[in-house]
Amino acid sequence: MTGKKAPAGLFAARKLRRKRLKFRWSQREFRIRMLDLKRKYDPLEGAPMARGIVLEKVGVEARQPNSALRKCVRVQLVKNKKVVTAFVPRDGGILYVDEHDEVIIEGIGGPRGRSMGDIPGVRYRVVMVNGVSLKALWEGKKQKPRK
């Protein structure tokens, strides 16, 4: 007859808790959180948003089965000089973004902080251009300031 896998006594709570804590290290999300790996490898360094300068406009081809050129920009972040690709949302949104503009980017909202939908390798999206919301520009509520 084989023994029990876990203690089942009246005073076994501490032992059970310690055992559970030990096995948490086999969970991916726990390891990433405890070792602070997001801050280490994320270009935004764990921040929800970041400021950057537009280097160029690029068209990224959509994944199968879709066929489109998703309008994106290459952005150099101010805080660490890293270059990332950010999606410019809305129909005609790219018309409000020019090279050398200052933009604010945020995560695009894909699973586990990755790319979303049919846009391969793009993890961020543009939310502001030269201090004005891209949505306000697109709706015609505000004018884009010249810097």
Curated annotation (Swiss-Prot):
Q: Which domain of life is it from?
A: Archaea
The UniProt entry, under InterPro entries, shows: NA-bd_OB-fold (IPR012340), Ribosomal_uS12 (IPR006032), Ribosomal_uS12_arc (IPR022863), Ribosomal_uS12_euk/arc (IPR005680)
Gene Ontology BP term (one): translation
Q: Which UniProt keywords apply?
A: Ribonucleoprotein, Ribosomal protein, RNA-binding, rRNA-binding
Any single GO CC term annotated in Swiss-Prot or TrEMBL for this entry: small ribosomal subunit
Which cysteines link up through disulfide bonds? none
- GO MF, any single term: rRNA binding
UniProt xrefs under SUPFAM superfamilies? Nucleic acid-binding proteins
Query: Which Pfam families did the record assign?
Result: Ribosom_S12_S23 (PF00164)
Record's function text: With S4 and S5 plays an important role in translational accuracy. Located at the interface of the 30S and 50S subunits.
Assembly and partners are described as: Part of the 30S ribosomal subunit.
| Similarity comment | Belongs to the universal ribosomal protein uS12 family.
Tell me the HAMAP family matching this sequence: Ribosomal_uS12_A
For this entry, the protein name equals Small ribosomal subunit protein uS12
